[in-house]
């Protein structure tokens, strides 16, 4: 019944909002070159990091297994060996992992979005206590029991899976403290941001939704779906889940795009059977001015 209702909702949504995917952000696209910042020291530090990352990974850019193996070491080396080491990261602990955030002296409210709660809102609770008053929090997880009850005191909770497309498909979900595959409705991430979250600038994006990151990360590339819809992410903590050969090939493509775009800098990486990354947007003027340029004054 839930799936039938969801499909009805999807049809109605597409009828009433047929153009939501084709909205173009004219001021921030592949064709437009914005002045990132007047802070020359930041620009020099960003170039230094890009050169480090590209140089150290050049032998891994054609081999998926090599990229998967070496990327963690290179990320940590390039942060430690370049001027980006000046950027002060604050650890925000979840029950079993560390998220990272760069705080801003600005008292402008922040926007924090979580995909995949996993019965753990410790990091979001800490951010709510330490970010400016009236900061806004949003999260999606398809399993309400436990997750919705935990998150609702923090912010707005949406009980569905989020992925690349709006459809009914299999998701890996945490249910009764075990991960299981379950067929369920998914809503595409652009609809989620534009029609539910209704925010275009995301200060902190916490993504741990058990696999869709392989499809969502390419949507953040230059000129891709996030750009086309005016969605900007300043900071991101993401888990890239255990990869078979097909996923390793996708991961290689993602990393090559990141290197070529020069938009995001990987600041922290650590691995279990998965990779966990903390990433900053070193290109968008809002993100640079609010969070990062002050470390190079």
From Swiss-Prot:
**Name of the molecule in the record:** Uncharacterized protein C28H8.8
The cross-references to Pfam families, in alphabetical order and at most eight, read: Methyltransf_21
Species per Swiss-Prot/TrEMBL record = Caenorhabditis elegans
Species lineage, top-down? Answer: Eukaryota, Metazoa, Ecdysozoa, Nematoda, Chromadorea
